[in-house]
């Protein structure tokens, strides 16, 4: 049986041809928690999730640690926080009544899964023609629905 210490080396060498983001090039044992380098900045999604309080505790703590060391990411978090506050303080968003009416007419689909009286056929999606009729309402006269009707109608 192979020495457990050499397995990580063999694993890293076997995958050394992959880009660094896919294969770890560190000397840390395989399966060890990843240590982020100071050059790895937070992604836009991570910044938004941090500002919105949507990160899990471990991710939040890692992001907070990075923010304490990285002025660039800290500035981006400040910008995101200001944008969030500006949106919350802006006027209420109003939806046009015509759009609200169209959205309220979307047929409700039964829950997925076979019903008691079904013979094994698929009962997913709206009844035939309902989705096509809905698509017709949003077509912009010049065929703007991009061929979806041909895929919906069977």
From Swiss-Prot:
According to its UniProt record, where is this protein located?
Cytoplasm
For Zn(2+), which residues are the binding ones?
66, 70, 73
Q: Which InterPro entries match?
A: Anti_sigE_RseA-like, Anti_sigma_zinc_sf
**Which GO molecular function annotation, any one, does this entry have?**
metal ion binding
The UniProt PTM text for this protein says: Phosphorylated by PknB on Thr-39; can be dephosphorylated (at least in vitro) by PstP. Phosphorylation is the signal for subsequent degradation by the ClpC1-ClpP2 complex.
A cellular component annotation (GO) from this entry: cytoplasm
Q: Which domain of life is it from?
A: Bacteria
Q: Changing residue 73 to A: reported impact? A: Considerably reduced interaction with SigE. Complete loss of interaction
Query: Per the record, what is the consequence of mutating residue 70 to A?
Result: Considerably reduced interaction with SigE. Complete loss of interaction
Region: Disordered; residue ranges are 104-154
List the keywords (alphabetical).
Answer: Cytoplasm, Metal-binding, Phosphoprotein, Transcription, Transcription regulation, Zinc
Q: Which GO terms describe its biological process?
A: regulation of DNA-templated transcription
How and how many cofactors are bound, per the record note?
Binds 1 Zn(2+) ion per subunit.
Q: Which residues carry this modification: Phosphothreonine?
A: 39
Composition bias (Low complexity) maps to 124-136
Q: What are the required cofactors?
A: Zn(2+)
* Stated role: An anti-sigma factor for extracytoplasmic function (ECF) sigma factor SigE. ECF sigma factors are held in an inactive form by an anti-sigma factor.
Into which family does the record put it?
Belongs to the zinc-associated anti-sigma factor (ZAS) superfamily.
- What interactions and quaternary structure are annotated? Interacts with cognate ECF RNA polymerase sigma factor SigE under reducing conditions; this inhibits the interaction of SigE with the RNA polymerase catalytic core.
Q: What is this protein called?
A: Anti-sigma-E factor RseA
Please report the organism this UniProt entry assigns to the protein: Mycobacterium tuberculosis (strain ATCC 25618 / H37Rv)
